[in-house]
Amino acid sequence: MNNKILIVSANYYREISRNLELGASNTLKENGFEYEVINVPGCFEIPYLIKKNINNYNGFISLGCIIKGDTYHFEVIANETTRKIMDLSVDFNIPIGFGVLTCYNLEQAIIRSDINQKNKGQEAALACIQLLK
């Protein structure tokens, strides 16, 4: 494998995820990395797809958006998704750039996914690249 990265991106809040994908893919291209993108329904499914492909890539980038609602669902999805992604990275000794937004409102998500502002997809890609060096 020649530094091939898998971007796993959640379709929930698709416009946000699309911008995160753009930030990540541009960064990977600029740094000479090959990559593929697989979309999953939501953030909770990201760890499954990473585990399923753990032996096929040099690193992963997890992208998605979780926005707080009126129930405990936000905490469950945010905490369990984050924990399992970290577990996979440590247990399999493989870099996983974390670009799953956990926001209190849509405005925060828009800012953090804006390609011209704080694009967290770009930051997740840079983290993965740095860990591969």
PLM feature segments, named:
Residues 48-85:
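Glycine-rich phosphate-binding loop
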Residues 118-133:
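A charged, well-structured terminal subsegment
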Residues 25-56:
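Active-site rim loops that border cofactor/substrate pockets in soluble metabolic enzymes
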Residues 2-37:
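Glycine-rich phosphate/diphosphate-binding loop of Rossmann-like nucleotide-binding domains
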Residues 11-12, 65-66, 101-105:
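Short, ordered loop/turn segments at secondary-structure junctions
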Residues 75-102:
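Short, acidic/small-residue loops that bind anionic groups at enzyme active sites
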Residues 104-119:
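Phosphate-binding/catalytic loops
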